[in-house]
């Protein structure tokens, strides 16, 4: 049974945290709080709740992390805040810039690093955000999964990626231009294995006092943690993308191992339930399908995929696979991708081949790795799997 805190429980926990911070001189990171939680925080300080609205605007519109610069907040309150609170986002450890304009940042989270990718285009600027240090799902074609898993990111470490990127590019409150128009939870980790922190972070993204993004411009991508997906619609409404990658259970069991627990039918039934109550998806889910040469890219696979998706309103993104060291796969040829796309289009599906961005700096889909202290022994397991695939393909 998936356990989640209600808003009231979270607010109560926030209050307890504030008391703990005051008593033990341990400062609370305000980036861990939604605006509603921050209003509770100010009430506990004996202040008017509207101060939270002012503070959220300073933090996210203006990228401000120094209380002394918040000039519409009186000095007495600023001094009080400095005693009990802080505003702290991950720092950039490494920045890499691609020839196509893509930027990848390795963000320092404790003694490890996660990766965040900024993808500018003519009509939008998308930020790809990580939700975990590593990933426990062990998808065989993904570089992140080969690093193993260490821990979930906190709310501040998730929303802090957006904050740090916005500060580098130019905050809305300073430039008058949104530095980021879209956020995709498609970085390192499985977001639905960290809903307790991912959902509040997305709430901040949607909050008009913070980033004010449309719910259609915040996308959560999942490999299919069905109980959490069923719970998600009760917590927040955002755009949904499904990392499907295979048209049958036998193949998906192998390349997306969570399928052994929640098979394709269970997943698609859950997707349809989500779509039935969501306003963020224009009635359609995005299906992500990585193209692996002679693994899942045959015409027969396209026909099978069409049958899987026939009762689910969707658009399909075909993703050319991006190689990483020691991977046991090859990239599908353009001709195989084209044939796969045309086969699906004959069924009436909208099918897009995703343009690869940032592959020269290992920032493309499936290439994010970061610096992870593995707690899952995945690094050792991947060597054995690679040897098995090599023998099978020989």
UniProtKB/Swiss-Prot annotation:
Keywords for the protein's UniProt record, in alphabetical order: 4Fe-4S, Cytoplasm, Disulfide bond, Iron, Iron-sulfur, Metal-binding, Methyltransferase, rRNA processing, S-adenosyl-L-methionine, Transferase, tRNA processing
The reaction(s) this protein catalyses: adenosine(2503) in 23S rRNA + 2 reduced [2Fe-2S]-[ferredoxin] + 2 S-adenosyl-L-methionine = 2-methyladenosine(2503) in 23S rRNA + 5'-deoxyadenosine + L-methionine + 2 oxidized [2Fe-2S]-[ferredoxin] + S-adenosyl-L-homocysteine; adenosine(37) in tRNA + 2 reduced [2Fe-2S]-[ferredoxin] + 2 S-adenosyl-L-methionine = 2-methyladenosine(37) in tRNA + 5'-deoxyadenosine + L-methionine + 2 oxidized [2Fe-2S]-[ferredoxin] + S-adenosyl-L-homocysteine
Protein name as it appears in the record: Dual-specificity RNA methyltransferase RlmN
Record: active site: 115 (proton acceptor), 365 (s-methylcysteine intermediate)
EC number(s) from the headed UniProt entry: 2.1.1.192
Source lineage: Bacteria, Pseudomonadati, Pseudomonadota, Gammaproteobacteria, Pasteurellales
Gene3D superfamilies: 1.10.150.530, Aldolase class I (3.20.20.70)
GO terms of molecular function: 4 iron, 4 sulfur cluster binding; metal ion binding; rRNA (adenine(2503)-C2-)-methyltransferase activity; rRNA binding; tRNA (adenine(37)-C2)-methyltransferase activity; tRNA binding
Disulfide bonds: 128-365
Gene Ontology CC terms: cytoplasm
Domain (Radical SAM core): residue spans on this chain: 121-360
Further comment found in the protein's record: Reaction proceeds by a ping-pong mechanism involving intermediate methylation of a conserved cysteine residue.
Necessary cofactors: [4Fe-4S] cluster
Family: Belongs to the radical SAM superfamily. RlmN family.
Subcellular locations according to the entry: Cytoplasm
Binding locations of [4Fe-4S] cluster: 135, 139, 142
GO BP of this protein: rRNA base methylation; tRNA methylation
Binding-site residues, S-adenosyl-L-methionine: 189-190, 221, 243-245, 322
First-listed, main subcellular location of the protein, grouped into a coarse class: cytoplasm
Coiled-coil region: none
Binding note for cofactor: Binds 1 [4Fe-4S] cluster. The cluster is coordinated with 3 cysteines and an exchangeable S-adenosyl-L-methionine.
Source organism superkingdom: Bacteria
Function: Specifically methylates position 2 of adenine 2503 in 23S rRNA and position 2 of adenine 37 in tRNAs. m2A2503 modification seems to play a crucial role in the proofreading step occurring at the peptidyl transferase center and thus would serve to optimize ribosomal fidelity.
């Amino acid at each position: 049974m998936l356990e989640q805190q209600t808003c009231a429980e979270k607010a109560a926990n926030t209050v307890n945290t504030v008391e703990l911070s005051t008593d033990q001189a341990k400062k609370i990171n305000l980036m861990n709080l939604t605006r509603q939680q921050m209003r509770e925080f100010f009430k506990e300080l004996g202040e008017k709740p509207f101060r939270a609205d002012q503070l959220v605007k300073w933090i996210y519109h203006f990228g401000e992390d120094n209380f002394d610069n918040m000039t519409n907040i009186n000095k007495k309150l600023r001094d009080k805040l400095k005693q009990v609170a802080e505003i702290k986002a991950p720092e950039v450890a490494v920045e890499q810039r691609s020839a196509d304009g893509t930027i990848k940042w390795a963000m320092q989270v404790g003694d490890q690093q996660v990766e965040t990718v900024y993808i500018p285009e003519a009509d939008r600027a998308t930020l790809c955000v990580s939700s975990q240090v590593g990933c426990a799902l062990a998808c065989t074609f993904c570089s992140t999964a080969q690093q193993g898993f260490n821990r979930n990111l906190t709310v501040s470490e998730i929303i802090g990626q957006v904050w740090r990127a916005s500060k580098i590019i130019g905050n809305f409150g300073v430039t008058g231009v949104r530095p980021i128009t879209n956020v995709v939870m498609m970085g390192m980790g499985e977001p639905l294995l960290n809903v307790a922190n991912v959902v509040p972070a997305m709430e901040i993204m949607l909050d008009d006092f913070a980033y004010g993004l449309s719910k259609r411009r915040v996308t959560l991508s999942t490999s299919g943690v069905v109980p959490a997906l069923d719970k998600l619609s009760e917590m927040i409404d955002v755009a949904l993308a499904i990392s499907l990658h295979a048209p049958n259970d036998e193949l998906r069991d192998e390349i997306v191992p969570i399928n052994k627990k929640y098979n394709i039918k269970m997943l698609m039934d859950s997707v349809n339930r989500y779509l039935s109550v969501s306003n963020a998806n224009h009635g359609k889910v995005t299906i992500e399908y990585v193209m692996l040469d002679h693994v899942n890219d045959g015409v027969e696979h396209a026909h099978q995929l069409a049958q899987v998706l026939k009762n689910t309103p969707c658009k399909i993104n075909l993703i050319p696979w991006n190689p990483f060291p020691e991977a046991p796969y090859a990239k599908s040829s353009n001709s195989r991708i084209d044939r796969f796309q045309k086969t699906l289009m004959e069924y009436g599906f909208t099918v897009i081949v995703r343009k690869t961005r940032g592959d020269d700096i290992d920032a493309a889909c499936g290439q994010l790795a970061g610096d992870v202290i593995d707690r899952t022994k995945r690094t050792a397991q991947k060597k054995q799997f690679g040897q098995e695939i090599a023998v099978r393909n020989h």
